[in-house]
Amino acid sequence: MDTIIMIPVATAIVSLLVGTVIGYAIRKHSWEQKVQNAQNDADHILADARAQVAAVKAEVNAQKQAAEAVKQSAENTKKEKILEAQEQIRDYKQKTEDKLNLKKDDLARQENRLKQREDTLDHKNSLLDEREAGLTKKEDQLKQQYTSLKAKLTEADELVEARRQKLYDVAKLDKEEAKKIVLNKLSDELVKERAELIRNSNEEVKAKADHYASQIIVDAIQSSAADTVAETTVSVVDLPNEEMKGRIIGREGRNIRSFEALTGIDLIIDDTPKVVTLSGFDPIRREIAKRAMERLIKDGRIHPARIEEMVDKARKEVNDDIYEAGESALMELGIHRMNPELVKTLGRLKYRTSYGQNVLSHSIEVGKLAGTMAAELGLDEKLAVRAGLLHDIGKAIDHDIEGSHVEIGVELTRKYHESDVVVNAIAAHHGDVPKLSFIAELVVAADTISSARPGARSESLENYIRRLTELEKIAKSYQGVKQAYAIQAGREVRVMVEPDEISDDRTVILARDIRNQVEKELDYPGNIKITVIREKRVVAIAK
């Protein structure tokens, strides 16, 4: 019974132990499972945390890289902006320096011009001072000479009286004879003093004026040149054959009559082969006739209606050429704003000659010379050029209007409102009225230079012979002149004097007197040189 009782107890104990063990095992397994789950959860959480940390790190790195990129971009942009700003600064600095250099160059050029002008003014002032000093010195010398001459005259009067008395007492001459001897002696002495004074004055004036005047004139002449033409009153037109003469004459000479009536030019048909001659004093009409005849010959149809048509065309063509010649002259001299009618009148000078010199070419040359000399003297160069160009404008229409070319030129320029200086230069260039300006003086000088240069002008044979004869006649009219010769086409007169009648001192006075008479009585182009030669030969024959 006890055993039976022990078995259940043992079983119960064993069961309890087994249950305890099993419960412990189950509980342990459960705890292990929970621990494992917790560990897994912790691993998951740690993995998630690590993933989040990695993501945050990646995001931080990305942001850091982005920040670095932004920073780098900002740095690059900053550098670019700095470089761009530096480039702009360099460009601005370079431009500023270039502008400053240009301004410096301009200022330097202006300074050089001002310095040159100042030097020129100083030079001119020096010349004026020298001239003033020379004039003052000359005035003092003249005063001294006047005082000396006055004293000499007083002394001469006393000497004359003393000699008169002495001659009267010693030679027993009457008063008139003694007076004649003394006056002849005194006249010889005064002639000697006068000749010496003339020589000294001429040398002094020449020494002071030659260099400066020559320099101005040479500069003016070197900058100018003009062609020369031969003066003529006929034009010759070539014909292709002799038959053309008959066609030009026409039935009963009607073509010639029509041509001459329309042109105002004589048509001469003679035995000269293959030419016809146009004769007339108006060069413009002659040019119109020549062009019309050349057109008719080329066309071949010659009858009054065709002649009238060709003359009208030639007249229009010549009028166009005249205006173009006037405009070309203005362009060559740089003259602007001139009345068209005055330009047309100026162009007519192309067909006008004076002593064989083309008047338009001469006027252009005078304008250049006057302008050059005006510039050298500090005067208005453009006004001088204008006055020089227009000084002979009256010659363009002096065949059509009554009056001298000077009067016509003055009236014409006043009509078209040219300045008073230009009008006075025209009026005074032949000495008809006083010169009221330095420019008028320059126009006269330029006109003389242009006319007097070799080859510029020629004369007709009749005028040439007459002028030479009158030159020799004037020279021979003086007492003591043995012979006189006009040489070098009348540009020099050589006067041979009797050595026993004319002294060396008196030759100076004789040359001066002949020059004054030539200037007063003769009209001539250029200058005439008067040369007085006194030669005494003594011959002794040894036997």
Curated annotation (Swiss-Prot):
Endoribonuclease that initiates mRNA decay. CDD domains: HDc, KH-I_RNaseY. Pfam families: HD, KH_1, RNase_Y_N. It is found in: Cell membrane. The lineage of its organism: Bacteria, Bacillati, Bacillota, Bacilli, Lactobacillales. InterPro entries: HD/PDEase_dom, HD_domain, HDIG_dom, KH_dom, KH_dom_type_1, KH_dom_type_1_sf, Ribonuclease_Y, RNase_Y_N. Residues 233-296 form the KH domain. One of its GO terms (molecular function) is RNA binding. The chain crosses the membrane at residues 4-24. It comes from Lactobacillus helveticus (strain DPC 4571). This is Ribonuclease Y. Residues 359-452 form the HD domain. It is a single-pass membrane protein. The gene is rny. Belongs to the RNase Y family. One of its GO terms (biological process) is mRNA catabolic process. It comes from the Bacteria. It is an enzyme of class 3 (hydrolase). PANTHER family: RIBONUCLEASE Y (PTHR12826:SF15). Keywords: Cell membrane, Endonuclease, Hydrolase, Membrane, Nuclease, RNA-binding, Transmembrane, Transmembrane helix. GO terms for cellular component: plasma membrane. SUPFAM superfamilies: Eukaryotic type KH-domain (KH-domain type I), HD-domain/PDEase-like. Its EC number is 3.1.-.-.
